[in-house]
Design a protein with these regions (language model features):
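Two-component histidine phosphotransfer core
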Residues: 1-149, 155-157
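Two-component histidine kinase transmitter core
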Residues: 168-173
Length: 178
């Protein structure tokens, strides 16, 4: 069964990396791709995703562990679950001067509508991620920054959410592993 094979691989990666502060972009993409493939099976034809990796990205660069999966899970749970039509998640990883920029965008119902509908969840995933980054930043001169944007059309109707993280080129996770 394809589902069980993918699920088993996902769990193996999660357990292997559970105690790590960071992992490579390549490893994070592998993990989130497995996660999204499993969710596609669940959502059937109502979920699409795209991962855009700028050609000059060094996929060995370290990023916070579970970063992409946390944002993708949040987008699925709050943004896309109640959306009519096909939901889409777009992940873009690119270099900017002095940092790597990673964005996760959904075309969901938006954060305000999700609050109105009372979508289930504790908000713990994003809270834990923010706390982890605060700890990482304590050990680095250059800081990781996170931004959340509410997307809308020309009529100010919500069209999704975009999470963006800026990771400085000289960021060091090594001191956190010891």
């Amino acid at each position: 069964n394809k589902y069980l094979t993918k699920y088993s691989r996902l769990m193996n990666i999660m357990l292997r990396d559970a105690d790590k502060a960071s992992r490579s972009i390549e490893q994070e993409i592998e993990y989130v791709t497995l996660y999204l493939e499993l969710e596609k099976m669940r959502f059937e034809d109502k979920l699409e995703y795209e991962i855009q990796l700028q050609p000059d990205i060094d996929t060995r660069k370290e990023i916070p562990n579970m970063l992409l999966q946390t944002w993708v899970e949040n987008a699925l749970k709050h943004g896309l679950r109640h959306k009519d039509g096909v939901g889409k998640i777009t992940i873009i990883i690119k270099n900017s001067t002095g940092y790597t920029e990673i964005s996760v965008e959904d075309n969901g119902i938006g954060r305000e509508k999700a609050k109105e509908l009372g979508t289930t969840g504790t908000g713990q995933g994003l809270k834990i991620l923010a706390e982890q980054i605060e700890i990482y930043n304590h050990f680095n001169k250059s800081k990781i920054e996170i931004r959340t944007l509410d997307l809308s059309d020309e009529n100010r109707k919500a069209t999704g959410t975009r999470f963006i993280i800026f990771i400085p080129d000289n960021y060091n996770f090594t001191s956190l592993e010891n």
